[in-house]
């Protein structure tokens, strides 16, 4: 049917390049020369050409992540987006985000992004204190960040996210509060505030670091929402805060289990009850990207039990929680019949709360969210 509503599909595109790998980073990324970057975008072009056009779907969001997707020549990003618009039905109001690091942006680059439909910028600041940026091994300064932020505003970006990191080595509670107020004072539309996680195999994983103690980390997290509220932000997910209507639609799609297709090196997908990812081997990806079946790995067909568990533990990441009605509509089962004991236990001990149709994590529950969510695995 011509007027029938198309089912939503999100796109994630992985650009694995950066200027220098940060000391805490365990993402699939690294520096590369111009030739390797061009070679990669050609491989990406072949993958996009080879996947189905999903004519029954509407692309509601596109997220270009990395790495640092603002490192390559902007014309490569622009050409890729043109190909995507020619291949898929991209909704006129689609949210199109690119991640960028301070110091990798200039006016013409931002202009090219806007001309090709990018309407949301996610800036990886991490901290407005140069001392903390140095500890993290970041290559930009707070001054360079401000220059990039105001340049993006002048270019016409009206939807900007800023990434912040707490529990940085040697960081005090006062440092964190100052960081929040400094960044909120810039009035971005969205702030993502993550706690530093020390990953094995990274330079941080091998060092003896002076990290904030548990009580300090607890206070940092617990007070973030209240501080940001003073500046007009509301918390809508465990680590995300937005001004009215500026929640990240792409990430909300992940938590609401909207299908997404991952393109590029190591990119993950959720498609028609299947989860899979592309190879993380660059040589293999470049050689076989024209044959999507050859680069796909970790194919997992989700059972109904898997999907119900995902509905619960992904949905509970959002402050609005999960809807019992939506669960019944999707699975044809009553949530209380499936998870009655788990719900009863966590409602009684105050980890979950219920308001009308919705069940959500309490403030207390958010701090032990992984433990609560694990109980929904049948």
Give residue ranges: language-model regions.
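Basic/polar N-terminal segments that are highly enriched at the extreme N-terminus
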Residues: 1-4
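C-terminal scaffold of the Radical SAM
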Residues: 6-8, 26-51, 58-333
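Short active-site neighborhood of thiol/selenol oxidoreductases, capturing the structured segment around
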Residues: 11-14
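Local cysteine-cluster metal-coordination motifs and their immediate loop/turn environment
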Residues: 16-27
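Short amphipathic alpha-helical interaction segments
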Residues: 332-345
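A short, conserved structural fragment
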Residues: 347-357
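Minor-groove-contacting beta-hairpin "wing" of winged helix-turn-helix DNA-binding domains
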Residues: 358-362
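Short, amphipathic alpha-helical interaction segments positioned at domain boundaries
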Residues: 364-378
């Amino acid at each position: 049917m011509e007027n029938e509503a198309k089912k939503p599909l999100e796109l994630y595109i992985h650009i694995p390049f950066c200027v220098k790998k940060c000391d805490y980073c365990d993402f699939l990324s690294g520096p590369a020369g111009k030739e390797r970057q061009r070679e990669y975008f050609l491989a990406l072009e072949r993958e996009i050409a080879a996947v189905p056009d999903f004519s029954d779907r509407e692309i509601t969001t596109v997220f270009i992540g990395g790495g640092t997707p603002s490192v390559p020549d902007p014309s490569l990003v622009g050409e890729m987006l043109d190909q995507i618009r020619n291949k898929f039905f991209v909704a006129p109001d689609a949210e199109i985000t690119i991640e960028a690091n301070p110091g990798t942006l200039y006016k013409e680059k931002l202009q090219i992004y806007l001309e090709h439909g990018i309407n949301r910028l996610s800036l990886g600041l991490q901290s407005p204190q140069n001392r903390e940026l140095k500890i993290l091994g970041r290559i930009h300064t707070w001054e360079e960040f401000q220059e990039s932020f105001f340049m993006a505003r002048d270019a016409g970006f009206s939807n900007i996210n800023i990434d912040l990191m707490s529990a940085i080595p040697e960081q005090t509670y006062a440092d964190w509060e100052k960081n929040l107020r400094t960044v909120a004072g810039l009035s971005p539309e969205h702030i993502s505030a993550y706690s530093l996680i020390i990953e094995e195999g990274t330079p941080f994983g091998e060092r003896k670091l002076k990290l904030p103690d548990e009580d300090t980390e607890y206070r940092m997290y617990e007070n973030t929402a209240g501080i940001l509220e003073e500046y007009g932000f509301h918390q809508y997910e465990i680590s995300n805060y937005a001004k009215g209507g500026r929640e990240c639609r792409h990430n909300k799609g992940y938590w609401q289990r909207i299908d997404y297709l991952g393109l590029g090196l190591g990119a993950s997908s959720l498609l028609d009850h299947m989860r899979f990812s592309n190879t993380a081997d660059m040589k293999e990806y470049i050689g076989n990207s024209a044959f999507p079946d050859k680069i796909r790995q970790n194919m997992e067909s989700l059972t109904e039990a898997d999907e119900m568990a995902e509905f619960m533990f992904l949905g509970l990441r959002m402050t609005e929680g999960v809807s019992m009605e939506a669960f019944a509509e999707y699975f044809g089962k009553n949530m209380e019949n499936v998870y009655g004991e788990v719900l009863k236990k966590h409602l009684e001990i105050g980890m979950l709360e219920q308001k009308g149709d919705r069940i959500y994590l309490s403030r207390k529950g958010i701090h032990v969210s992984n433990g609560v969510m694990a109980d929904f695995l049948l």
